[in-house]
Amino acid sequence: MATAPSPREENVYLAKLAEQAERYEEMVEFMEKVCAAADSEELTVEERNLLSVAYKNVIGARRASWRIISSIEQKEESRGNDDHVSTIRDYRSKIETELSNICGGILKLLDSRLIPSAASGDSKVFYLKMKGDYHRYLAEFKTGAERKEAAESTLSAYKAAQDIANAELAPTHPIRLGLALNFSVFYYEILNSPDRACNLANEAFDEAIAELDTLEEESYKDSTLIMQLLRDNLTLWTSDMQDDGGDEIKEAAPKPDEQY
């Protein structure tokens, strides 16, 4: 007779079901229960990827909504439709509250449990990168002192991740490449530093190319995909530094079978 699954295993399975059903809010809840069950123990690679996918989808939907509403707001403003602008701003504020709450939830989990329990180099980089990502998402819509604080927290997390990645992970490692991708996007979009963005992306790409023959088979697909995204962004950024941002900038979006 098969032994009954532990609550942790059960919640991992439920998270996978929720993912298949595209019920990402519930997927987050199940993975938060997994984190609670793990206590001070490190999550498995599968568990951390499921957690990342859950939050990425929950935040991704709101980030997309915010961009659409902000675009409509700009159009209505240019037309002088003040009544509409006021309504849109209230609605945008509602989305921003949701974004703040989601980011706050994962950042608290990262600081209280995930980063302290990370033992291996790749898990430390994974979680510090994740911390940088969610501070960056806050910086996308915050203004004034709050934006400055979010940007500084992003930079601090990405730099800490970069130090460990450079010391412990190969240039072709998908987590190191994913960090370089998102860090360069931060320089370009949040700090308005296209030169630094291009330098970082270019260096990561060149270092990976130089060691491509050492790439392990299981991570070949993941690594080459991120390298292509780095190349896409470099092409976009260098083609016209004055571009209005109409083209979509690529960032690392993990799937369950991808290690970044």
UniProtKB/Swiss-Prot annotation:
Residues 247-260 have a biased composition (Basic and acidic residues). Pfam families: 14-3-3. Belongs to the 14-3-3 family. Residues 240-260 are annotated as: Disordered. This is 14-3-3-like protein. It comes from the Eukaryota. PROSITE patterns: 1433_1, 1433_2. The lineage of its organism: Eukaryota, Viridiplantae, Streptophyta, Embryophyta, Tracheophyta.
